[in-house]
């Protein structure tokens, strides 16, 4: 019996959702989100979640599964996603998104320490500041410190958290156990100028859809200190609401920071030779992707 996983990845604003909907409808399959912010409820416009209408077309999973005050670990994401994949392999489920580590955890079968978040420990570590935390990491887990950027607070805290809970460096608890089922990885890309244009259009559309109002509502409900408010788009709108930026300045900053983020995503995904790349602007995109899927997974046109 034919079975396999279809991955659609690439930088933000490259059309992953639209392509995924086309393929999933043709295969009568499901879409599993691989986006680290779309897991959170109420953070909708700024995370470019599929619209309710799009979600009505095809079953979507791992969207709106967490309270914004919660933290979803990579291990928890991997467990949830892998369970969905295993149950739907014969329908060729689609894993879709731009969070490279989420996708890597599945396609590489990453071995991830099952250490639950430790709020008190994190609070104590955060009080030390990122610079001191990174210095501690260099002492207790040199290997991890060489892989983690000095300014990457999330990964630094996680590495220290695992070390203090288990007594073993996270680098010694990691490895890979790739799945045995077939996987086709489809990457979407376009020229830098086209991506810039798409990001500008998307940002304007978000603002027109009520992005500012979304953030105002979230601040009223949760206060100003949610970690998610430090992420792309939300941080800039928060600065606008606090009078630090005009709305046009916030828009320009969102566009700039999104372009920088997209560049990092491109660099990440380009490092994996198994990804088959397609020009998202091609009028034959869907046909070309289906040809690849048919060739690799034995799908019937």
Curated annotation (Swiss-Prot):
Superkingdom of origin: Bacteria
EC numbers on record: 2.5.1.75
GO BP term (any one): tRNA modification
SUPFAM superfamilies documented for this protein: P-loop containing nucleoside triphosphate hydrolases
Required co-factors: Mg(2+)
GO molecular function: ATP binding; tRNA dimethylallyltransferase activity
UniProt xrefs under Gene3D superfamilies: 1.10.20.140, P-loop containing nucleotide triphosphate hydrolases (3.40.50.300)
Keywords, ordered alphabetically: ATP-binding, Magnesium, Nucleotide-binding, Transferase, tRNA processing
Binding site for ATP: 10-17
Interaction with substrate tRNA, annotated site positions: 99
InterPro entries for the chain: Dimethylallyltransferase, IPT, P-loop_NTPase
Pfam families: IPPT (PF01715)
Residues where substrate binds: 12-17
Catalysed reactions listed for this entry: adenosine(37) in tRNA + dimethylallyl diphosphate = N(6)-dimethylallyladenosine(37) in tRNA + diphosphate
Ranges for region Interaction with substrate tRNA: 35-38
HAMAP family per record: IPP_trans
Record's function text: Catalyzes the transfer of a dimethylallyl group onto the adenine at position 37 in tRNAs that read codons beginning with uridine, leading to the formation of N6-(dimethylallyl)adenosine (i(6)A).
Subunit structure: Monomer.
Family: Belongs to the IPP transferase family.
Protein name (database record): tRNA dimethylallyltransferase
Species this chain originates from: Crocosphaera subtropica (strain ATCC 51142 / BH68) (Cyanothece sp. (strain ATCC 51142))
Lineage: Bacteria, Bacillati, Cyanobacteriota, Cyanophyceae, Oscillatoriophycideae
Protein's gene: miaA
